[in-house]
A protein has these predicted regions:
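Class I S-adenosyl-L-methionine
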Residues: 1-134
Length: 134
């Protein structure tokens, strides 16, 4: 949708985005196409956590952990749960790829392991900023 509306990156608009899936792909697109996430919050709806993003024109650089676990969620009360859910999904994907005999899948599994490591680091930062959960 944003690809078809490049004028939204010209600095005159604030966008409110709530990706239902693949939020990491949206964050990467935003970073690569002249958008910046000003604020990000998590919303729990029927047992599923969704990120909501306030996006403006601008430049931003996101780490691997931020691409997958959220750009501006350090103080969000759902942040820890959101990161854990991402880690579990990625670990399931890694387990599935482990049974593959295709060389490309080994590389994909290695990349997913790097993402899990980045998310674990991000989770520790979140816990340090917010204190351990009970």
């Amino acid at each position: 949708i944003l690809s078809a509306a490049p004028w939204t990156a010209m600095g005159h608009h604030t966008l409110l985005l709530q990706p239902m899936t693949r939020s990491e792909a949206l964050r990467l697109f935003l970073m690569d196409h002249g958008y910046a996430i000003k604020r990000e919050a998590l919303v729990l709806d029927r047992g599923t956590i969704y990120p909501c993003m306030e996006v403006i024109a601008g430049q931003m650089r996101l780490s691997t952990g931020q691409l997958w676990g959220g750009a501006r969620l350090r103080q969000d009360p759902l942040g820890d749960t959101y990161i854990i859910q991402k880690i579990i999904r990625l670990q399931r994907a890694i387990a599935g790829l482990r049974h593959s005999e295709r060389p490309d899948d080994y590389e994909k599994a290695d990349r997913l392991r790097e993402i899990v490591t980045a998310l674990l680091s991000m989770r520790e930062e979140w816990r340090h900023a917010n204190g351990p959960r009970n």
